[in-house]
């Protein structure tokens, strides 16, 4: 009887877990859909910025992609604040470690900034001397405006570095996400030397280009952030789907074990009743 009660408690517990994983899977699917819409809009915005740059003359403008020597490198690492998303964070941590080793082998000074605390927690013990800061609570970023405020309030000074890279899990499809690196600074805008038309700029085209370049870099960061968020939600959705399947298999095994134990208990009770009846006769 005690064994049957224990099995019933396990079945109840697994059913509760199954409900939780199912809800988390549905929530992740809904969040993934919203992030995909934001990602599509952000890419359109980046395309518009790129087209504007095509009309800015480059004579006399310092090209931000013409830095000859790169000595100090900042890696902005995107991860998640929460777990239960498969190997999502493990992939970006492994990719970051490999990237750091490659840069240091080229005699570069590497510093790290983390968006999302999971990768930070996994790398702190080994790279504590290279970490400048970590920013958690990234779920509060709901749109591009909040993202800009988040970056400004973070106090990141890109001017201290010759090269700034952002490392994130790039979203390709719902079944394919891979770690990727995107260069932020120098920002390769690809400004043409000759233009078909000439425009006048206020106050100067240097200021115009500077403003556009800043917007371009922020937009690249925002797209990487959205790509990483989409990959996180997709990984969590797949992980919860797998967990849901496992709970179904476990429930089937527990139900079979419960029925066998119950049948054995009933058989034992019947044998005892028959034996008692025979002893009375």
From Swiss-Prot:
CDD domains: F1-ATPase_gamma (cd12151). GO terms for cellular component: plasma membrane; proton-transporting ATP synthase complex. Its main location: membrane. HAMAP family: ATP_synth_gamma_bact. The gene is atpG. It is found in: Cell inner membrane. Gene3D superfamilies: 3.40.1380.10, ATP synthase, gamma subunit, helix hairpin domain (1.10.287.80). It comes from Ehrlichia chaffeensis (strain ATCC CRL-10679 / Arkansas). This is ATP synthase gamma chain. One of its GO terms (biological process) is proton motive force-driven plasma membrane ATP synthesis. Keywords: ATP synthesis, Cell inner membrane, Cell membrane, CF(1), Hydrogen ion transport, Ion transport, Membrane, Transport.
């Amino acid at each position: 009887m005690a064994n049957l009660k224990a099995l019933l408690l396990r079945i109840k517990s697994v059913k509760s877990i199954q409900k939780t994983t199912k809800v988390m899977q549905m929530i992740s699917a809904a969040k993934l859909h919203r992030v995909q819409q934001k990602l599509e809009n952000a890419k359109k915005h980046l395309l518009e910025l790129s087209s504007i740059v095509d009309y800015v003359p480059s004579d006399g403008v310092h090209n931000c992609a013409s830095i000859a020597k790169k000595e100090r490198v900042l890696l902005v690492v995107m991860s998640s604040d929460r777990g239960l998303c498969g190997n999502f964070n493990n992939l970006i941590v492994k990719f970051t470690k490999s990237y750091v080793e490659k840069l240091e082998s080229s005699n570069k000074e590497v510093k790290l900034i983390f968006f999302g605390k999971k990768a930070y927690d996994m790398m702190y013990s080994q790279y504590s001397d290279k970490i400048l800061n970590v920013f958690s609570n990234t779920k509060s970023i709901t749109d591009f405006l909040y993202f800009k405020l988040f970056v400004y309030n973070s106090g990141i000074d890109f001017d201290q570095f010759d090269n700034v890279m952002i490392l994130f899990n790039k979203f390709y499809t719902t079944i394919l996400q891979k770690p990727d690196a995107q260069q932020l600074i120098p920002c390769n805008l690809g400004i043409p030397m000759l233009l078909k038309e000439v425009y006048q700029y206020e106050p100067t085209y240097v200021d115009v280009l500077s403003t556009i370049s800043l917007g371009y870099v922020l937009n690249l960061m925002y797209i990487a952030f959205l790509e990483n968020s989409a990959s996180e939600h997709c990984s969590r959705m797949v992980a919860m789907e797998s967990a849901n399947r496992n709970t179904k298999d476990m429930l089937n095994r527990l139900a079979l074990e419960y029925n066998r134990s119950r049948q054995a208990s009933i058989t034992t009770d019947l044998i005892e009743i028959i034996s008692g009846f025979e002893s009375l006769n």
